[in-house]
Protein backbone atom coordinates (compact mmCIF):
# COMPACT_ATOMS: atom_id res chain seq x y z
CA UNK A 1 0.00 0.00 0.00
CA UNK A 2 2.87 2.39 0.83
CA UNK A 3 4.62 1.83 -2.50
CA UNK A 4 1.35 2.00 -4.40
CA UNK A 5 0.51 5.25 -2.63
CA UNK A 6 3.78 6.73 -3.89
CA UNK A 7 2.91 5.64 -7.40
CA UNK A 8 5.99 3.43 -7.75
CA UNK A 9 6.03 1.13 -10.73
CA UNK A 10 5.55 -2.54 -9.71
CA UNK A 11 9.01 -3.51 -11.00
CA UNK A 12 10.65 -0.95 -8.68
CA UNK A 13 9.60 -2.50 -5.38
CA UNK A 14 8.94 -5.82 -3.71
CA UNK A 15 7.94 -6.87 -0.19
CA UNK A 16 9.65 -9.83 1.48
CA UNK A 17 8.04 -11.40 4.54
CA UNK A 18 10.42 -12.15 7.40
CA UNK A 19 10.59 -12.38 11.19
CA UNK A 20 13.31 -9.97 12.29
CA UNK A 21 13.83 -11.99 15.49
CA UNK A 22 14.74 -15.11 13.50
CA UNK A 23 18.18 -14.75 11.93
CA UNK A 24 17.68 -17.26 9.11
CA UNK A 25 14.33 -15.66 8.24
CA UNK A 26 15.74 -12.16 7.81
CA UNK A 27 18.87 -13.42 6.02
CA UNK A 28 16.69 -15.41 3.62
CA UNK A 29 14.62 -12.29 2.90
CA UNK A 30 17.79 -10.40 2.04
CA UNK A 31 18.96 -13.17 -0.25
CA UNK A 32 15.58 -13.22 -2.00
CA UNK A 33 15.88 -9.47 -2.49
CA UNK A 34 19.31 -9.90 -4.07
CA UNK A 35 18.04 -12.66 -6.35
CA UNK A 36 15.00 -10.76 -7.61
CA UNK A 37 16.00 -7.09 -7.40
CA UNK A 38 19.77 -7.13 -7.56
CA UNK A 39 22.17 -5.39 -5.19
CA UNK A 40 20.73 -2.15 -3.74
CA UNK A 41 22.73 1.00 -3.11
CA UNK A 42 21.35 1.44 0.42
CA UNK A 43 20.18 -1.03 3.07
CA UNK A 44 18.39 0.43 6.10
CA UNK A 45 17.98 -1.67 9.25
CA UNK A 46 15.06 0.04 10.94
CA UNK A 47 13.17 -2.63 12.88
CA UNK A 48 12.95 -1.90 16.59
CA UNK A 49 10.77 -2.31 19.67
CA UNK A 50 10.62 -0.30 22.88
CA UNK A 51 9.05 -1.79 26.01
CA UNK A 52 9.50 -0.64 29.59
CA UNK A 53 11.55 -2.84 31.87
CA UNK A 54 11.94 -3.52 35.59
CA UNK A 55 14.91 -5.81 36.24
CA UNK A 56 13.33 -6.96 39.51
CA UNK A 57 10.50 -8.58 37.52
CA UNK A 58 11.46 -11.95 36.02
CA UNK A 59 9.34 -11.66 32.88
CA UNK A 60 11.03 -8.38 32.01
CA UNK A 61 14.31 -10.22 31.49
CA UNK A 62 12.52 -11.92 28.60
CA UNK A 63 11.51 -8.47 27.36
CA UNK A 64 15.17 -7.51 27.29
CA UNK A 65 16.06 -10.65 25.33
CA UNK A 66 13.31 -9.91 22.81
CA UNK A 67 14.44 -6.30 22.52
CA UNK A 68 18.02 -7.29 21.75
CA UNK A 69 16.87 -10.01 19.34
CA UNK A 70 14.97 -7.38 17.37
CA UNK A 71 17.03 -4.22 17.76
CA UNK A 72 20.51 -5.73 17.57
CA UNK A 73 20.68 -9.29 16.23
CA UNK A 74 17.98 -8.44 13.70
CA UNK A 75 19.93 -5.38 12.58
CA UNK A 76 23.12 -7.36 12.01
CA UNK A 77 21.18 -10.10 10.21
CA UNK A 78 19.62 -7.46 7.95
CA UNK A 79 23.06 -6.23 6.90
CA UNK A 80 24.63 -9.68 6.57
CA UNK A 81 23.52 -10.75 3.05
CA UNK A 82 24.59 -7.46 1.51
CA UNK A 83 28.07 -6.95 2.97
CA UNK A 84 30.02 -9.36 0.75
CA UNK A 85 28.43 -8.28 -2.56
CA UNK A 86 28.67 -4.58 -1.66
CA UNK A 87 32.33 -5.03 -0.77
CA UNK A 88 32.95 -6.86 -4.04
CA UNK A 89 31.24 -4.04 -5.96
CA UNK A 90 33.11 -1.41 -3.95
CA UNK A 91 30.10 0.73 -3.07
CA UNK A 92 26.93 0.87 -1.01
CA UNK A 93 25.62 2.11 2.32
CA UNK A 94 24.43 0.23 5.40
CA UNK A 95 22.24 2.39 7.61
CA UNK A 96 21.56 1.48 11.23
CA UNK A 97 18.73 3.27 13.02
CA UNK A 98 19.81 3.92 16.61
CA UNK A 99 18.23 6.48 18.97
CA UNK A 100 19.17 9.37 21.22
CA UNK A 101 18.08 6.96 23.97
CA UNK A 102 21.33 5.11 23.30
CA UNK A 103 23.41 8.05 24.53
CA UNK A 104 22.38 7.92 28.20
CA UNK A 105 20.36 5.37 30.14
CA UNK A 106 16.87 6.36 31.26
CA UNK A 107 15.08 4.82 34.27
CA UNK A 108 12.61 2.16 33.17
CA UNK A 109 14.11 2.07 29.68
CA UNK A 110 16.99 -0.28 30.41
CA UNK A 111 16.36 -2.73 27.57
CA UNK A 112 15.74 -0.10 24.90
CA UNK A 113 18.53 2.27 25.93
CA UNK A 114 21.04 -0.57 26.16
CA UNK A 115 19.99 -1.96 22.78
CA UNK A 116 20.35 1.41 21.06
CA UNK A 117 23.69 2.08 22.72
CA UNK A 118 24.73 -1.28 21.29
CA UNK A 119 23.51 -0.24 17.83
CA UNK A 120 25.72 2.86 17.99
CA UNK A 121 28.78 0.86 19.05
CA UNK A 122 28.10 -1.97 16.59
CA UNK A 123 27.75 0.39 13.63
CA UNK A 124 30.91 2.19 14.68
CA UNK A 125 32.74 -1.15 14.78
CA UNK A 126 31.33 -2.19 11.40
CA UNK A 127 32.32 1.17 9.91
CA UNK A 128 35.91 0.51 10.93
CA UNK A 129 35.81 -3.02 9.55
CA UNK A 130 34.59 -1.82 6.15
CA UNK A 131 36.89 1.19 5.93
CA UNK A 132 38.51 1.33 2.51
CA UNK A 133 36.00 -1.07 0.95
CA UNK A 134 33.82 1.65 -0.54
CA UNK A 135 30.91 0.57 1.67
CA UNK A 136 29.69 3.27 4.04
CA UNK A 137 28.11 2.61 7.42
CA UNK A 138 25.72 5.32 8.60
CA UNK A 139 24.26 5.62 12.10
CA UNK A 140 21.06 7.65 12.42
CA UNK A 141 19.89 8.60 15.92
CA UNK A 142 16.26 9.75 15.87
CA UNK A 143 14.75 11.80 18.63
CA UNK A 144 11.01 11.53 19.24
CA UNK A 145 8.92 10.64 16.18
CA UNK A 146 5.13 10.93 16.23
CA UNK A 147 3.94 7.33 15.83
CA UNK A 148 1.22 5.19 17.44
CA UNK A 149 3.91 3.70 19.71
CA UNK A 150 5.32 7.01 20.95
CA UNK A 151 1.81 8.32 21.60
CA UNK A 152 1.63 5.79 24.44
CA UNK A 153 4.52 7.46 26.26
CA UNK A 154 3.69 8.98 29.63
CA UNK A 155 6.23 11.78 29.49
CA UNK A 156 7.04 14.92 27.51
CA UNK A 157 8.67 14.40 24.10
CA UNK A 158 10.59 17.54 23.13
CA UNK A 159 11.17 18.36 19.47
CA UNK A 160 8.60 15.76 18.38
CA UNK A 161 8.86 15.18 14.62
CA UNK A 162 6.40 13.98 12.03
CA UNK A 163 7.52 10.77 10.31
CA UNK A 164 7.85 12.38 6.87
CA UNK A 165 9.99 15.21 8.24
CA UNK A 166 12.29 12.69 9.87
CA UNK A 167 12.45 10.58 6.71
CA UNK A 168 13.39 13.61 4.60
CA UNK A 169 16.19 14.60 6.98
CA UNK A 170 17.46 11.03 7.26
CA UNK A 171 17.49 10.72 3.46
CA UNK A 172 19.49 13.94 3.22
CA UNK A 173 21.99 12.71 5.81
CA UNK A 174 22.44 9.36 4.07
CA UNK A 175 22.83 11.07 0.68
CA UNK A 176 25.45 13.42 2.14
CA UNK A 177 27.52 10.44 3.24
CA UNK A 178 27.65 11.29 6.94
CA UNK A 179 28.73 8.55 9.34
CA UNK A 180 26.58 9.67 12.28
CA UNK A 181 23.64 12.03 12.61
CA UNK A 182 21.11 12.79 15.36
CA UNK A 183 17.76 14.02 14.03
CA UNK A 184 16.53 16.64 14.74
CA UNK A 185 19.69 18.62 15.39
CA UNK A 186 18.19 20.07 18.58
CA UNK A 187 18.10 16.60 20.10
CA UNK A 188 21.72 16.19 19.11
CA UNK A 189 22.61 19.24 21.19
CA UNK A 190 20.51 17.98 24.12
CA UNK A 191 22.13 14.55 23.90
CA UNK A 192 25.65 16.00 23.99
CA UNK A 193 24.77 18.13 27.01
CA UNK A 194 23.27 15.13 28.81
CA UNK A 195 26.42 13.12 28.13
CA UNK A 196 28.50 15.85 29.77
CA UNK A 197 26.39 16.05 32.93
CA UNK A 198 27.96 14.52 36.05
CA UNK A 199 26.09 11.39 37.16
CA UNK A 200 24.73 12.99 40.33
CA UNK A 201 23.26 15.90 38.33
CA UNK A 202 21.87 13.59 35.65
CA UNK A 203 20.30 11.25 38.22
CA UNK A 204 18.69 14.15 40.07
CA UNK A 205 17.31 15.62 36.85
CA UNK A 206 15.55 12.34 36.04
CA UNK A 207 14.23 11.69 39.54
CA UNK A 208 10.46 11.20 39.39
CA UNK A 209 10.36 11.08 35.59
CA UNK A 210 7.51 8.88 34.32
CA UNK A 211 8.75 5.53 33.07
CA UNK A 212 8.10 3.65 29.89
CA UNK A 213 5.07 1.38 30.16
CA UNK A 214 5.97 -2.23 30.83
CA UNK A 215 4.38 -5.03 28.84
CA UNK A 216 2.25 -6.09 31.83
CA UNK A 217 2.71 -3.01 33.96
Where do the model's predicted regions map?
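Rossmann-fold cofactor-recognition segment
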Residues: 6-24
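Conserved mid-core segment of classical short-chain dehydrogenase/reductases
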Residues: 50-65, 108
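Active-site helix of classical SDR
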Residues: 79, 115
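Residue(s) in the substrate-gating loop at a strand-loop-helix junction
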Residues: 99
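Active-site-adjacent segment of SDR/Rossmann-fold oxidoreductases
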Residues: 104, 125-136
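Active-site loop-to-helix junction immediately N-terminal to the catalytic Tyr of the SDR YXXXK motif
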Residues: 106-113, 125, 153
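C-terminal helical subdomain
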Residues: 139, 155-191
Amino acid sequence: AWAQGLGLAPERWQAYAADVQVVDSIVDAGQRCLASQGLPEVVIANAGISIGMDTAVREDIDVMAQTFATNNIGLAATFHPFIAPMTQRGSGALVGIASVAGIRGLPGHGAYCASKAAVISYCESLRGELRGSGVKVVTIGPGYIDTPLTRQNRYAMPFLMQPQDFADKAFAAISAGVSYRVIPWQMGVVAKLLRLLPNRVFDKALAGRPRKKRRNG
